[in-house]
C-alpha cells in the first residue's frame, strides 16, 4: 500500500545542480572524469604489466593538466562579439575609468636580492644648463649697458647743467624740461643713427641766447674748447658778399671738430645764433650735415639753432590762451611753430622744436633781482618794482607779459651805476 502511494507521487525536480553556476558543474564533471580515469588506467596498467609507480606518475601529470584546464575554463569570460551598436555613455565612462585605473597602477621595480635598492638614475639634458648660462650672459650685458649709460650721463654732468638752467633761466620751465630730455636721451650713448638738431624759437628777450651761452659754458668746462662751437651770424659772416668764403669756413670748422671728437669718443656741440639772418647758402651747408646718409662720425653731434622765427606766432598763441594753462598745450604750439619754420627752410624738418614763450611780470622781477645782485647792488624791492614798471607789457586776463622780455634789464641796471 505504501509502495503504491510513493510511486504515485510526482518526483521532485533536482534544482540544486541546475542552479549551480557553470564553473561548479565543470568541477563536478571533472571529478567524475578523474575517478573514471583512475579506475580505467589503473586497470590497464595492472593488466599491461607496467609498474605501480609509473602509473601513479602518469596519473599525477594527467590530474595536473586537467586542473589547469579547469582553472582556465572557470576564469574564462564570455566572448564579446563585434556589432555595430553605438555604445552608451555609461559604458564609455566605465571603460575610461578602467583605463585610468590601469594606468595609475605603478609598475614595481624588480631589484636583485643581493644589491642595494635605489631608483634608476635619470639622465638630465645639458641643454637646460646652456639655457641658464645664456640667460645669465644676457642679464650681465644688460646691466653693463645700463652702467655705461650712467657713466656717459655722469661724464657730461647733465644734472649740474639742469640745475644751472633752472637757476639762471626764468619763466621757461617747460623749455628747459624738453631740452634736458633730448640731451639725456642723446648723450647717454656714443653711437647714433642721426645727429641731434635742436631749435630754440621764440620772441626776443625770452632767454634763447642766454640758454645757448649757458650750454656753451657748461660743455666747455666738461670737454675742451675744441669740441664746442659758438657761431654768431652777424659776427662770423656779416657781409652777404662773403657767403662763399663763409661756406668753406663753416664746413671746415664742423668737419675738423667732428674728426677730433670722433678720435676721443666725444660728442661735439655746435651752437648757431641769429639763424633768422643766416643766408640760404649757409643753411644749405648745415642741412647737409643733418642728413642720415653720411659716415658714422657725422651722426654723433649736437646742433642748436637759435632764432626769432616763429616768435610772432608764439606771442599770439600765448595771448589767446592766457586764461588757460598753455603749458598743457605743447602739441598745438609745436604745430604752429613748425609750420612757420618750414616756410623758411627745409632743414627744420629734422629739428626738434623747443619753443620759448613770453615772460610774465614776475619773471621780469626775477631778472632785475639777479642782475642787481650780479652787479653788486642792494636788492631793494621797491627799486626793483620801479625798474620793472618802466618796461612795456601785454595785458591779458589780468596777466602782464613783457613785450621785450629781459633784454632791457641790463641797460636799466647800468643806468643806476653813476648814482652809486
From Swiss-Prot:
Keywords for this protein: ATP-binding, Membrane, Nucleotide-binding, Transmembrane, Transmembrane helix
Keyword NAD: no
A cellular component annotation (GO) from this entry: membrane
Subcellular location: Membrane
Sample GO molecular function, one term: ATP hydrolysis activity
Disulfide bonding pattern of the chain: none
TM stretches of this protein: 130-150
Residues that hold ATP according to the record: 202-209
Any Pfam family the entry gives: TOR1A_C
Family, per entry: Belongs to the ClpA/ClpB family. Torsin subfamily.
Identification of the protein by name: Torsin-4A-A
Organism the protein comes from: Xenopus laevis (African clawed frog)
Lineage, uppermost ranks: Eukaryota, Metazoa, Chordata, Craniata, Vertebrata
Protein encoded by which gene: tor4a-a
